[in-house]
Amino acid sequence: MEHTYQYAWIIPLLPLTVTMLIGLGLLLFPIATKNLRRMWAVPSVLFLSIGMLLSVELAIQQINQSSVYKYLWSWTINNDFSLEFGYLIDPLTSIMSILITTVGILVLIYSDNYMSHDQGYLRFFSYLSFFNASMLGLVTSSNLIQIYIFWELVGMCSYLLIGFWFARPIAANACQKAFVTNRVGDFGLLLGILGLYWITGSFEFRDLFELCNNLIPNNGVNSLFATLCAFLLFLGAVAKSAQFPLHVWLPDAMEGPTPISALIHAATMVAAGIFLVARLLPLFIVIPYIMNLISLIGVITLLLGATLALSQRDIKRSLAYSTMSQLGYIMLAPGIGSYRTALFHLITHAYSKALLFLGSGSIIHSMEPIVGYSPEKSQNMALMGGLTKYVPITKTTFFWGTLSLCGIPPLACFWSKDEILHDSWLYSPIFAIIAYATAGLTAFYMFRMYLLTFDGYLRIHFKKYSGNKKGSFYSISIWGQKELKPVNSNFLLSTVNNNEKVSFFSTKTSQIDGNVRPLMHSLSIHFSNLSKKDIFTYPHESDNTMLLPLLLLGLFTWFVGLIGIPFNQEEEGFDILSKWLIPPINLLHQNSSSPVDWYEFITNSILSVSISVFGIFTASLLYGSVYSSFKNMELINSVVKISPKRSLLDRIINVIYNWSCNRGYIDVFYARSLTMMIRGLAQLTHFFDRRVIDGITNGFGIVSFFVGEGIKYAGGGRISSYIFYYSSYVLIFVLIFYFFI
């Protein structure tokens, strides 16, 4: 066992080797390296697979023997300061290493085909391998300085990959936004690290925890300063894991290639913040204010992400807000003291979300030959629909991921999310109500996404999208801004009846172009009849190298939840994950000898599943073609129209829709307050520099110039005159000095 741990430092170096080899090949043999570019996918997958095998072996040894290994190299040592680098192998490290390597391998296999026609193929794989190396270095770090170094490397890689297609202005702006937003958190993290070093005199985790646990409860250090340091550390996690209010970069990060979205949202960047909170949880526990803040930020984020996902039309942005919401669940768990549950949901969500993102990439890949390569069209769910018969494997795996995220048993996310919901009741009923309500919203927007993508008919073949002011039930559209075009004839997507319209609650979609803007007036969408002479192209299923990762992630989505299921009813914690996490940290279940209450578990599960099923049913009712017999909900409309509160309901729906479409007005607030304030300050600084500072400098030059010119014309060229003037000036200064000083 000792022999295996000694070589654990190889794990983060393996993917880094690929990056170095690609760079060396481009430097020495540029033409051959570019011509044989797809060859580099093999060592990328191979080296990361070796890292995965080492991680699995370390995890097995830890499960069997509950061991923790730490190896350090002294870098700088003197009487007052010492800095050591090394690696720490404990249950948290092994969990994260397996997660990063398994998802990373599947993303690499998927990317080989997805990026095969891109000119930046080699650059993409070098960035991707460096990304994996940075994240593996982060999770194996033995102290806060190492964490900060790899933390910045992860941020740099995300900047490069989000802006991979930097020639597109929107991608360049997105990576800049991610970079600037994360700088706020990174600066807070750095200040927190320096503050803790000032308190404890050490960067090592064990020393930090021991000293803080002794000093803070016994008032050995200023509690306000310790709380401030802990808050600054948590601020780094807030930015990296896209928690409110530093979440604004996450939806824009979808401008990068889809495999990067899968990696960022599943196993690397957003998981880094959760990892930091989990690693520093022994420190946060002794500061109750920080624990309350963590849980509060988590519950706000999970609700905010769910509401913002309700009306998105971009399939990747919908998944991005879903990630934000699920990360809120994961952040809520350690805040309420449920460490094991947080890691459990981190694992299950990572595989499910990687499956959904790679599935969306397969969908986008199939749509691009039809609509073009613009993300505004290829990622627009308004142009999709009816893809079931064209991409059946993608549809099946996407359906698995959707059910898992909705919390439907026996898929993975059901087991972990249900534990978070149960623990939230023990901590705060208010938080529990919000968490349960968000579970219903999650089921709604996930099935909305699934139905808009796979149900009904392929909407791209319906030409001449147009708006019409004639009434439909609700006064808002599904996608946004109206387009004033004449309507020739109508064609309904789910039936062959004419004069059927699409509202916010219908199964259809509206206009495909323009910004997403709310409509306060009635807007219905019509489609002109198909021309029989037109020959259409249709989507096609992806290649095997893209489908294989989907199927493998589908298996993970089905079975990875088993690691957290207690199989022994007589003893709590008799599951793989609980044996793995030794020593456990759980403030809500401190009595580990109590048996598992299966009756309580089943009761809570029935409640959570019922809420999810209600969300699924609502989405199916409003967006599914199965209910087309209602003639576009005329029955429901007639019932609701009888109610005198219809106008109030309309206003509520409009408020929710406007909130979701405008990203909760948070981006607008930042743009109008922070951005405009910084630009105003920059303009003021520019004015002061040009007019005041430069004015003073230039003023001295101008005055000297005119004085010189005046003296030049006063002089006659006679030396005797110069001597006279000089003597006169000297005499005047002597007299002034003698009489007045």
From Swiss-Prot:
**Its domain of life?**
Eukaryota
Gene Ontology terms for molecular function = NADH dehydrogenase (ubiquinone) activity; quinone binding
Summarize the protein's role.
NDH shuttles electrons from NAD(P)H:plastoquinone, via FMN and iron-sulfur (Fe-S) centers, to quinones in the photosynthetic chain and possibly in a chloroplast respiratory chain. The immediate electron acceptor for the enzyme in this species is believed to be plastoquinone. Couples the redox reaction to proton translocation, and thus conserves the redox energy in a proton gradient.
Its subunit composition reads: NDH is composed of at least 16 different subunits, 5 of which are encoded in the nucleus.
Q: Which family does it belong to?
A: Belongs to the complex I subunit 5 family.
Q: How does it sit in the membrane?
A: Multi-pass membrane protein
Keyword annotations: Chloroplast, Membrane, NAD, NADP, Plastid, Plastoquinone, Quinone, Thylakoid, Translocase, Transmembrane, Transmembrane helix, Transport
Q: What is its EC number?
A: 7.1.1.-
Question: Where does this one sit in the cell?
Answer: Plastid, Chloroplast thylakoid membrane
What sections of the sequence does the record tag as coiled-coil? none
Offer one example of a GO biological process linked to this entry.
Answer: electron transport coupled proton transport
Q: What species is given as this protein's source?
A: Ceratophyllum demersum (Rigid hornwort)
Membrane-crossing residues? 9-29, 40-60, 89-109, 125-145, 147-167, 185-205, 219-239, 258-278, 280-300, 327-347, 396-416, 425-445, 547-567, 606-626, 721-741
- Kindly state which reaction or reactions the protein catalyses: a plastoquinone + NADH + (n+1) H(+)(in) = a plastoquinol + NAD(+) + n H(+)(out); a plastoquinone + NADPH + (n+1) H(+)(in) = a plastoquinol + NADP(+) + n H(+)(out)
Name a single GO cellular component. chloroplast thylakoid membrane
Q: Which InterPro entries match?
A: NADH_UbQ_OxRdtase_chlpt_su5_C (IPR002128), NADHpl_OxRdtase_5_subgr (IPR018393), ND/Mrp_TM (IPR001750), NU5C-like (IPR003945), Proton_antipo_N (IPR001516)
Supply the PANTHER family for this chain: NADH-UBIQUINONE OXIDOREDUCTASE CHAIN 5 (PTHR42829:SF2)
NCBIfam families hit by this protein:
NDH_I_L, PRK06590.1
Know the name of this protein?
Answer: NAD(P)H-quinone oxidoreductase subunit 5, chloroplastic
Note one Pfam family from the annotation.
Proton_antipo_M
